[in-house]
C-alpha cells in the first residue's frame, strides 16, 4: 500500500460489492475518513482513502488513475470531499475513464476564505467526535481551507462529466456556499443534489454522517442493480401524519 493511503475491506466472508476511492480535501490526512471508511466497508464496499489531493495534484491524479485501473470489483465510484471533489470531477471528465459514478461533497466553487483556525473548526462540523479529529494537527492542517486551490485543480466543463454524480452539500456551508455549487451541478448531464439542512462543510463527517453515508449506499446500490422497489406501509392503527 502506498504511504498515506488507508484501505478498508469488506467483512470476512462477504462478497465485495463495489470499489470506492475517497479523495480527501485540503490539509486532510486519510485518517480523517476512518469513520466513513469503516461504515461503508461494513456494507461490503472496498474503500481506499487518498490524503490531501492539493499537496501534489499531478502526482495524486496519477496515483488515483492507477487505483481506478487496479480496482476490483466494479463499479468504481470516486468520492471527493472539498478539493477532492474537484479532482474527482476532473478525472471523470477524462476520455476512457473507468469511473462509473461520483459522489462529491462540499464542492469548493469559491476557493478561499479568511478566517482563523478556531472559526474553521466551527465552520467545518458540528459533530463533537469529528471536532476532536479536526483539532489533531497530525490529521488536519487547521488553516488549509483558507488557501486557494492549486492551479491544477480547476473544475472541468460540466458537459465533459457524463457519469452519474451524487452531490452532497450542507446548506449552512460557509466555506463553500451551496449556491455556487448548485449552479455547476445544474449543468451536469446526470447530477442529483442532496441538500443537508444545517449541514456544514465537512458534510461527510458532520452530525448527519449516518444519513449521508446511507444516501451514498443507496446511490451505489442503484448504480449496481437499479433503483430498489421498497414498499413502506404503516399499521392501520398508526397515524403517520397527525393533523
Predicted regions and their residues:
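Active-site nucleophile elbow and catalytic-triad environment of alpha/beta-hydrolase enzymes
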Residues: 139-158
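Acidic catalytic loop of the alpha/beta-hydrolase fold
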Residues: 171-176, 201
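Short alpha-helix in the alpha/beta-hydrolase fold that links the catalytic acid
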Residues: 36, 163, 177-186
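Catalytic active-site module of serine/aspartate enzymes centered on a nucleophile-bearing elbow/loop
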Residues: 192, 197-243
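Short beta-strand/loop motif that positions the catalytic acidic residue
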Residues: 160-161, 167-169, 173
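Short, surface-exposed "cap/lid" segments of acyl-processing enzymes
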Residues: 2-55
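Primarily recognizes the serine-hydrolase "nucleophile elbow" in alpha/beta-hydrolase
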Residues: 68, 72-120
